[in-house]
Amino acid sequence: MVQVRELIDDAEELIVVSPVYFSGAPSQMKALLDRLQPYFWAGARHGEKRPATLHIVGEGGDPHGYGALVGEVRSALSCACFSLTRVLDWVGRIDEAGEISGEADELVLEPLGSAFDDGVRAGAGSLQGP
């Protein structure tokens, strides 16, 4: 984890790609997010934020969408001095052969402090998925 923290500390921008499981982060992603906790106690969350992008992949069809995944990633990355600025929805756009079959939708994030539970405003995408 020391090497991962060094890479995170040196990064000007972070790009995260994660599948969505039951509306949230899979265990491997959750383990990484949990390991960002020391940044919280070090006060890093108060520093200047660096941009982060989240690419969401999966088969789709979950009626609960993936708002929980976005919230988890947004909160944890904030502790490490990143601001989730883009969320790209690839759910249902990668075929069984691993080929991309369409363009990602860019989701519109609500500003922090608003009703983030609603996920996104109507627009380019929805955290409810297709």
Name these PLM-found stretches.
Residues L77-P130:
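Glycine-rich phosphate/pyrophosphate-binding loop and the adjoining helix
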